């Protein structure tokens, strides 16, 4: 792949956030966007290049991981710290649970001066993300004995069953979470935000491109050094 040395906007890392940012910017059709990802780009959802464990929404993926481990403390063993190294980042790797959280967090952030982060102001974006990421509830046929046993056990502790785990104003409750699984496939952020703009002429995706330095001039990042095909490549954001 011939990597352009200049682009309008550079996005480093195609994790969940990077995929969303690059996809949204490229959809505006007014600037060239380059997305650099240290791991491989397996292409769109129908490319047939995706490893089975990254697609399978019923298991936690084990491949294409950075291999981080926690430090051993007080004689305790190291623990794996799963961080995906592939297009879509950890949205290509995780348990597909879609939980919005509590209004308390968002309203607290806004009270600290972060305007626009109140629960009511972020709520429309949650609905939009749910639609784009194909978030849905489990079908009755998908509910396993484990799910049922877990929910029943939690109810016995006094925590009530809730009809909607994503009610920002429901402060406690148990239920089976919504998931971003489409036809048994983990519907990751790359599928949701990059696939629609892959061929529009405004987005370039460079997989296996490890950024090892961001160059800053006058408090503004203007270029990066990336290792591509074992060579250091300088790419500018104009």
Residue ranges and their predicted role:
Residues 1-238:
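N-terminal redox-cofactor-binding region of secreted/periplasmic oxidoreductases
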């Amino acid at each position: 792949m011939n990597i352009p040395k200049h682009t309008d906007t550079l996005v480093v890392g195609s994790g969940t956030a990077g995929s969303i940012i690059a996809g949204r910017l490229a959809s505006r059709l007014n600037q060239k966007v380059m997305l650099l990802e240290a791991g491989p780009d397996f292409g769109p959802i129908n490319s047939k290049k995706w490893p089975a464990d990254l697609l399978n929404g019923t298991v936690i993926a084990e491949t294409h991981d950075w291999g981080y481990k926690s430090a051993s403390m007080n004689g305790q063993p190291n623990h794996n710290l799963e961080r995906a190294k592939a297009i879509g980042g950890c949205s290509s790797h995780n348990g597909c649970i879609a939980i919005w959280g509590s209004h308390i967090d968002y309203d607290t952030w806004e009270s600290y001066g972060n305007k626009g982060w109140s629960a009511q102001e972020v709520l429309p974006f949650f609905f939009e993300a749910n639609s784009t990421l194909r978030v849905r509830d489990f079908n009755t046929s998908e509910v396993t004995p484990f799910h049922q046993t877990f929910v029943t056990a939690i109810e016995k502790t006094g925590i009530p069953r809730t009809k909607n785990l994503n009610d920002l104003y429901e402060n406690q409750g148990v239920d089976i979470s919504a998931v971003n699984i489409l036809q048994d496939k983990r519907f990751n952020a790359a599928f949701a935000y990059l696939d629609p703009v892959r061929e529009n002429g405004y987005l370039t995706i460079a997989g296996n491109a490890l950024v090892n330095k961001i160059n800053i001039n006058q408090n503004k990042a203007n270029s990066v050094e990336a290792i591509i095909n074992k060579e250091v490549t300088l790419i500018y954001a104009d």
